[in-house]
Swiss-Prot record:
<dbReference type="GO" id="GO:0005576">
    <property type="term" value="C:extracellular region"/>
</dbReference>
<dbReference type="GO" id="GO:0031160">
    <property type="term" value="C:spore wall"/>
</dbReference>
<protein>
    <recommendedName>
        <fullName>Antigenic protein SchS34</fullName>
    </recommendedName>
</protein>
<keyword id="KW-0325">Glycoprotein</keyword>
<keyword id="KW-0020">Allergen</keyword>
<feature type="glycosylation site" description="N-linked (GlcNAc...) asparagine">
    <location>
        <position position="69"/>
    </location>
</feature>
<dbReference type="InterPro" id="IPR057229">
    <property type="entry name" value="DUF7907"/>
</dbReference>
<keyword id="KW-0964">Secreted</keyword>
<feature type="glycosylation site" description="N-linked (GlcNAc...) asparagine">
    <location>
        <position position="27"/>
    </location>
</feature>
<dbReference type="GO" id="GO:0005737">
    <property type="term" value="C:cytoplasm"/>
</dbReference>
<dbReference type="Pfam" id="PF25484">
    <property type="entry name" value="DUF7907"/>
</dbReference>
<dbReference type="GO" id="GO:0097736">
    <property type="term" value="P:aerial mycelium formation"/>
</dbReference>
<feature type="glycosylation site" description="N-linked (GlcNAc...) asparagine">
    <location>
        <position position="215"/>
    </location>
</feature>
<keyword id="KW-0963">Cytoplasm</keyword>
<feature type="glycosylation site" description="N-linked (GlcNAc...) asparagine">
    <location>
        <position position="141"/>
    </location>
</feature>
Length: 221
């Protein structure tokens, strides 16, 4: 008998577009762990918790418009930030990661007035998919004191750690599920003349036209 021909694996990834503005869409990476009701394909939005202070939450309808802010060199070396304009007149609200009290690995995402955390970015080549980094992002069911203890879905981020025996720990708290935040192209908001925000360094970002239309099981390896 002749040799068995090895099956050639042809990489297949979803087509991306380019836009300065984008929404962030929640992709629940393990559907069996999803909340009830599901938050898959929900949009990232802000949760007001004080003057110019916001947690990052989710909503069923298109949420905040984001853009990557930085020079070409800053984008290349992961020193850019992700910003969403807010308030009147518009000011930049930067996406930041604030370490949780008592934790070395879990941070809470914030969208406060200011520049945001450098290194929060949309993935680039050679990574074949587009998603927000650094991973792993989480969606967590948390009570917020600002709302008298009411529960909200809050976005957090956890660092992956490796144990002495080589085991990998994704450090996902019990009240959280792992998610990816996927950029969906949208038109960047225009700014009025009195805006404190600026789009001078709003970068072209690779994003998907319609995240909810993507069947992720069709892509790979």
């Amino acid at each position: 008998a002749g040799p068995i021909a090895s099956r050639q694996i042809v990489p297949n990834y979803p087509a991306s577009s380019t836009s300065k503005g984008f929404h962030l869409v929640v992709n629940v990476t393990d559907p069996s762990a999803d909340f009830t009701p599901s938050i898959n394909n929900f949009y990232v939005n802000s949760i007001h918790v004080g003057a110019a202070l916001n947690y990052v939450g989710v909503t069923a309808v298109p949420g905040r418009i984001f853009y990557q802010n930085g020079t070409a060199e800053e984008i290349r070396y992961a020193q850019s930030t992700v910003i969403s304009d807010g308030a009147t007149p518009p000011v930049p609200f930067g996406l930041s990661l604030r370490p949780d009290e008592g934790s070395d690995v879990v941070s809470t995402a914030r969208l406060d007035a200011g520049p945001g955390t450098t290194g929060v970015r949309v993935s680039r080549f050679p990574e074949p998919y587009r998603f927000l980094q650094p991973e792993t992002f989480l969606a967590c069911n948390e009570s917020l004191a600002y709302y008298q203890g009411d529960y909200f879905t809050v976005i957090k981020q956890a660092d992956v750690t490796v144990g002495d025996d080589g085991s990998i720990d994704y450090n996902v708290p019990d009240n959280c599920i792992s998610v990816r935040l996927i950029p969906e192209c949208t038109e960047l908001n225009e700014l009025p003349e009195d805006a404190y925000a600026s789009h001078e360094f709003a970068a072209d970002t690779q994003c998907y036209d319609d995240v909810s239309a993507l069947n992720w099981s069709e892509y790979g390896p």
